[in-house]
A protein has these predicted regions:
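Membrane-embedded alpha-helical bundles of polytopic integral membrane proteins
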Residues: 1-68, 72-105
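Acidic (Asp/Glu-rich) catalytic motifs at the cytosolic membrane interface
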Residues: 41-57, 69-70, 105-145
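Juxtamembrane boundary at the C-terminal end of a transmembrane helix
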Residues: 151-154
Length: 154
C-alpha cells in the first residue's frame, strides 16, 4: 500500500467518526451534554482568542502560528470555569470540572489537528461558507475531537 493512497479516504473518515461521536453524546447523555460540549469548546476558543490578543507573546505551535501559549492557557481556564458552572446543574462538581478541562484540552488538539491537515493539503481556509472565519471546519474542528472525550468521560 502507498501512504498517498490513504489521503482520499480521510475525506470520508474525518467527518464520519465525529458525527458518530456527537450522536453518541446525544444518545448517552441527552441534549444538555451536546449543548454543554459546544459551550465548553466555544468558551475555549473565545477565551483563547481574547486572552491571546491581550497578553499573547509566546508562540504555541508552528502548525498554527497565530496561537499563543497565553491564549491557550486562557482558553483552558475559561472553558474549565464556564463548563464547570454549567455542568454542575446535571453532573457532580468533580465530573463537571474534569470533563470541562479535558474537553477543552482536546478542543485545542482538534484545532491543531485540523490546522495540520490543512497545511498538508496546502489549503488556507476550509471553505467560504462562513466568511471571515476560515470555513466550516475551522468552526467545528475542536468539537470534532472533543466529542470523543465527552463520550469517554460521561
Amino acid at each position: 500500500y502507498k501512504k498517498a493512497s490513504l489521503k482520499p479516504a480521510l475525506i470520508y473518515i474525518y467527518p464520519s467518526l465525529p458525527i458518530l461521536a456527537l450522536w453518541q453524546v446525544y444518545l448517552d447523555q441527552g441534549m444538555f451534554a451536546l449543548f454543554w460540549l459546544i459551550i465548553i469548546v466555544a468558551a475555549c476558543d473565545s477565551g483563547a482568542y481574547f486572552i491571546g490578543k491581550l497578553m499573547g507573546k509566546t508562540p504555541f505551535s508552528p502548525i498554527s502560528p497565530n496561537k499563543t501559549l497565553e491564549g491557550v492557557i486562557g482558553g483552558l481556564i475559561c472553558a474549565s470555569v464556564i463548563g464547570t458552572i454549567l455542568g454542575v446543574f446535571v453532573y457532580s462538581f468533580w465530573l463537571s470540572s474534569l470533563c470541562s478541562f479535558f474537553v477543552a484540552i482536546f478542543a485545542v488538539i482538534g484545532d491543531l489537528l485540523e490546522s495540520y491537515f490543512k497545511r498538508e493539503a496546502g489549503v488556507k481556509d476550509s471553505g467560504d461558507l462562513i466568511p471571515g472565519h476560515g470555513g466550516v471546519l475551522d468552526r467545528i474542528d475542536a468539537v470534532i475531537i472533543a466529542a470523543f472525550v465527552m463520550v469517554a468521560l460521561l
